[in-house]
């Protein structure tokens, strides 16, 4: 029944999280954090189901860094149009899980050849984008009938955000303070009095 589906999926996701925790290379994770901290511009690339992960990462990076570019178009030509100015002062994090996007693979190869720091978040060392990565972050992801399980990859994204936030406390606090003022002034959010 439906209860069994819930238990089965949640248990499988817990297993994926455990596997990811045991196999994620901590040196690569630390290197990725440093590369992002040093970058002039951060490009975040993820298409199809990986676009959700890229969007979430990009959303939080905007609180910490001035120049963040999110690329989620599945069009290979548009991906290259958005990456054409990447330089050795920049970093890109590409996210790709099966079925692997050829656009993401080609784009990361281009970024590496352009001298940028390349971070790849994918499911294994043999994934197509792994070849272009300076820093390879792996997270277990399996197809569950129609859907990809992105729980473990999202957890790695969350860990990156927390690690970066702890290193950019001042910048993040300043941004949030300014945003709170703007939100109040322009009534962006409803205030609920309890």
Model-identified regions with their sequence ranges:
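Glycine-rich phosphate-binding loops that contact phosphosugars or nucleotide phosphates
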Residues: 40-155, 159-168
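Glycine-rich phosphate/diphosphate-binding loops that line cofactor/substrate pockets in enzymes
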Residues: 27-40, 86
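A short, charged, Gly/Pro-tolerant segment at domain boundaries
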Residues: 170-194
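Short, charged beta->alpha transition segments
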Residues: 4, 27-32, 78-81
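HTH-adjacent hinge/linker in prokaryotic transcriptional regulators
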Residues: 1-27
């Amino acid at each position: 029944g439906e209860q069994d589906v819930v238990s089965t999926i949640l248990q499988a996701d817990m297993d994926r999280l455990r596997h990811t925790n045991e196999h994620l290379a901590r040196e690569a994770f630390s290197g990725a954090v440093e590369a992002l901290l040093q970058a002039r511009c951060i490009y975040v690339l993820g298409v199809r189901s990986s676009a959700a992960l890229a969007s979430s990462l990009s959303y939080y990076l905007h609180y910490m860094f001035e120049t963040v570019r999110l690329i989620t178009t599945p069009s290979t030509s548009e991906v290259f149009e958005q990456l054409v100015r990447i330089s050795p002062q920049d970093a890109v994090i590409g996210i790709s899980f099966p079925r692997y996007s050829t656009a993401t693979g080609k784009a990361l190869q281009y970024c590496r050849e352009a001298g940028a720091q390349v971070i790849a978040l994918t499911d294994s060392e043999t994934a197509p984008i792994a070849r272009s990565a300076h820093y390879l972050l792996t997270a277990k992801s399996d197809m569950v009938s129609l859907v990809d399980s992105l729980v473990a990859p999202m957890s790695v994204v969350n860990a990156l955000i927390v690690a970066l936030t702890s290193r950019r406390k001042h910048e993040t606090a300043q941004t949030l303070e300014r945003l709170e003022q703007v939100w109040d002034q322009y009534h962006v959010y409803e205030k609920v009095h309890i």
